[in-house]
Amino acid sequence: SRGLGDVYKRQIEDTIHLLSYPDFTQQGTGITYQISPQSFYQVNPKQTEKLYSTALAFAGLTGNENVWDLYCGIGTISLFLSQKAKQVYGVEIVPQAIEDAKNNAKLNGITNAQFFVGKAEEVLPQFYENAKKTEKITDDTASTGCTDMLRPDVIVVDPPRKGCDEKCLDTMLAMSPERIVYV
C-alpha cells in the first residue's frame, strides 16, 4: 500500500477548468485568495475565520513582530497575520501552493510576506544555520537582516496530521521565539 509520502510525489499532469470563479474573498479576513487545484484550503469559512482569529490572538501581534508560518499552504494564515506583523516568512512543501501564496500577496498588495518552497524541517534549520553564520547575535544586536529570521518573535505552525518533525521542533526551540502558536 502507498504511504502518505506518496501523496506529494504525484503531480497532476493536466487539469481542465470547467466552472468556478477565479478567486474568492474569505469572509471576515479581508484577504482575497486564488487557489490552484494542487493547493490545500480550509473549506469551512466560518470556522476558518475563528481559527485564524484565535491564532492571531495567541500570536499577540502589535505590528512590530517577525513571524515564521510553517506549513503555510497558499498563505492564508501568513497573509492574515501580515496585517498585524512587521514581516512574515512562510514555508510550504507544495510548489504550486507557494506560487499561489506569492500571487495572493501581490493580489492583496501585501509586501511584508516572503514565501519559500520546501519541507519545514529542512528550510527552517537551513535558514537558522545560515543566519547564525551571517550575523553574530548578541544581546545588544539590533533586529535587522538575518537576525529577523534567526530570532523571530512568533512561529506559527499548522502541520499535516503527522505533526511537526523533531528537527523542526528543535530548531523552533533554538530560535527562542516569544511565542509558538501550534494550530
Which residues does each predicted region cover?
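Rossmann-like S-adenosyl-L-methionine
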Residues: 2, 6-183
